[in-house]
Amino acid sequence: MKSQLLAATAVALLAFAPAAAQGAKPTPAEAKAFVDKAEADLAAFNQYVAKSSWVRATYITEDTQWLEAKATGEQNELVTRYAMEAAKYDGVAVDPVTARKLKLLKLYLVSPAPNRPGAAAELATLTTRMDSTYSSGKFQYKGKTLTLNDAEDILAESRDPAELKAVWEGWHSIAKPIKPDYVKFAALSNEGARGLGFKDTGALWRSNYDMDADAFAAETDRLWKQVEPFYRNLHCYVRGQLNDKYGDAVQKRTGPIRADLLGNMWAQQWGNVYDVVQPKGTTSSYSLDKLLTAKGYDPLKMVKTGENFYSSIGMTPLPETFWKRSMITRPQDREVVCHASAWDLDDRDDIRIKMCTKVNGEDFYTVHHELGHNYYQRAYKDQPFLFKNGANDGFHEAIGDFVGLSALTPTYLQQIGLLDKAPGADEDIPFLMKMALDKIAFLPFGLMVDRWRWEVFSGEVNPEHYNEAWWKLRLKYQGLVPPGDRPADAFDPGAKYHVPGNTPYTRYFLAHIYQFQFHRAACRQIGWKGPLHRCSVYGEKEMGKKFNAMLEMGASKPWPEEMAVFTGEKTTDASAVADYFQPLNAWLTVQNKGENCGW
């Protein structure tokens, strides 16, 4: 199989549509023939790349890194040449389907390689090495060697500011060796993007949303302005509670928050410090962590429970191969990429997840989220190859998050027997606080990661100022500062997986808006009359049919058309976030009276 795929690649690199060689204006028929050939060749090659990547992610060695780099390098070269050829059909009066495929072909690669010998292989080597350096990162603390998982546990559980600072700095130190590779990667990726007609890689990324690149940047600004006041309200309250806990010497009552005090390595979700910021005079009658343990859940049962949710809304159970081939727990005998992800290895039925699952509420949610990717992948499996994707990358993230909103409700926990009785309305504020500490706290981080990369790719920020620019944006959007002065050669962006892993991040910001819009629409469809945060769509098969109809469209239509199939709306509307959290935002406004909010 491998030799056949490589042979097909060699043919593909030499055999483009004849119109290009003739120099005459291509015809619509030639454009369609070109697209058909490109799809066939890319589909044939995709399985080889996917399986090489899976092996490397689940068994990190020099050999598997070499294999993945070779496969992705060959794919990058193939796609880059096809993408450049696609540009030659600009202006040809093709049918709408062919036109969309030509556009998607030019946008296929996250980071296209320059069209010159050796460039694709070099880019693939850099991206594989950065990912592996991050994934195998370790540091010393109190005579012990700590992994990211170890460090995350300490940040979640410790309330010793000195320990938090030391562990935070320890993990961030692993990113320093990544910087030289990132500098080279950014330059190569930009060269490739410019070869396809984009100003830089950032402009290429922003062109993936069925609108002009600059219009998309403005759209994310619009959405951020809709939710920013709520974030600032939450920030103000949390900062006050941290000040009560630690005092002025650690966390002042005004200004930004120290990033290591929020229970998460990147301060992107703050739910782990709920014990510090819990609304006074309120109680939570249950802990999802404790419920899972008490009911005898293990990682496999958690995934089975996630599957059951999707089955309850009418989706076909996962294939047997999913259970045989997925990595559900962390192996003890080798290095793996623990970052949770969902995989489609053959564009048909070989779907899998890769997780180092722990029995806790966070991973209970993550399971429902990752399975959302798998069910989306399977829903669009009958689409042509270039349409086998989400309506946009934010949709792909939002599908599982939408299900996750139901999965965390006491309504659902009672439906599946984890909770004997749903709590009363007096527990709504603590429930919404827990949700906001994860969902609302995330929003500015979801925005700023790519804001930083856009500045890097555009040349606005040069390598000497990478770290300074990173913290300038973290202060601007999140109101956060590091726990101490950062070394001049630090590369703190590299301590977040998606930077060395080369995964665009604005998708997560969008997903955190879309999921509430989907949730509100679904709850209206099922006739839910209560507060949005109590609504569960578990068991709602009619709603599931409408939902799956959107998923089956893949990337075949612009995302507004696909969104309308399920929600009836063609624009992104963050008012659903406000609707969901309205009781908490009103409560926070009262609590913050007299505080000097902002930073």
Language model segments and positions:
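Active-site scaffold of zinc-dependent metalloenzymes
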Residues: 162-169, 333-360, 367, 371-378
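Active-site-proximal, well-structured secondary-structure segments within enzyme catalytic domains
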Residues: 145-148, 157, 184-354, 424-432, ...
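N-terminal helix-rich structural modules
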Residues: 22-184, 202, 496, 503-506, ...
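Post-HExxH zinc-binding segment in Zn-dependent metallohydrolases
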Residues: 216, 220-230, 390-427
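Positively charged n-region of N-terminal signal peptides that target proteins for export
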Residues: 1-4
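Bacterial N-terminal signal peptides
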Residues: 7-17
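C-terminal, non-catalytic "cap/extension" segments appended to globular domains
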Residues: 23-30, 64, 200-203, 269-284, ...
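Post-HEXXH active-site segment of zinc metalloproteases
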Residues: 202-203, 207, 377-403
